[in-house]
Amino acid sequence: MAGGYRAEDDYDYLFKLVLIGDSGVGKSNLLSRFSRNEFNLESKSTIGVEFATRSIRVDDKIVKAQIWDTAGQERYRAITSAYYRGAVGALVVYDITRHVTFENVERWLKELRDHTDQNIVIMLVGNKADLRHLRAVSTEDAKAFAERENTFFMETSALESLNVENAFTEVLTEIYKVVCRKALEVGDDPAALPKGQTINVGKDDVSAVKKVGCCSS
């Protein structure tokens, strides 16, 4: 890594992301592909909640993503509030081969927006893009929906590692930009923030500026 070795817990920002969408759309495999570069064909539905972390570089800052994954099945919806709390980014995932999972995106978006800050960065993700011959949701329909809902959009394949890195990286980069804009809007000099100051993008301080400096370019 440029600039020398940095310890795992050495980061400038910590951003909480959530993965949502129907059960079986590939949320857990997207998470394992991004965080560990692994894919498990035998993966079962996630029971309860799990999360993984990974740090990336944005500009000259280290951004650590804490990515939460839960089953999309209705019986787990009691964990909703705690799951969303503090999230500043979300990947709303559907399966391009199952149209019903795309139809349900609207409900997932409503639930997400009911529980998070208005500035949350959202990426609509059409997963399983490797199954082109089974496609049930057109790229054009999904793009049009994303534009109407003011979200980003990308098609991915956790199996082939297609666009997985790009989807997470784009969300994290956009969150970073939002944090920087908010610091600038209130008249702060982002480079002069007191050490350890938190900038709230969401409803609590899960996503925080850990050290001095923001967007100094």
From Swiss-Prot:
UniProt-recorded Gene Ontology molecular function terms: GTP binding; GTPase activity
Source domain of life: Eukaryota
Motif segment (Effector region): 43-51
A GO BP entry: vesicle-mediated transport
UniProt keyword terms in alphabetical order: Cell membrane, GTP-binding, Lipoprotein, Membrane, Nucleotide-binding, Prenylation
Record's bilayer topology term: Lipid-anchor
Pfam families: Ras
InterPro entries named in the record: P-loop_NTPase, Rab_GTPases_membrane_traffic, Small_GTP-bd, Small_GTPase
Gene: RAB11B
GO cellular component terms, A-Z: endosome; plasma membrane
Record's subcellular location: Cell membrane
Upper lineage: Eukaryota, Viridiplantae, Streptophyta, Embryophyta, Tracheophyta
Protein name: Ras-related protein Rab11B
Binding site for GTP: 21-28, 69-73, 127-130
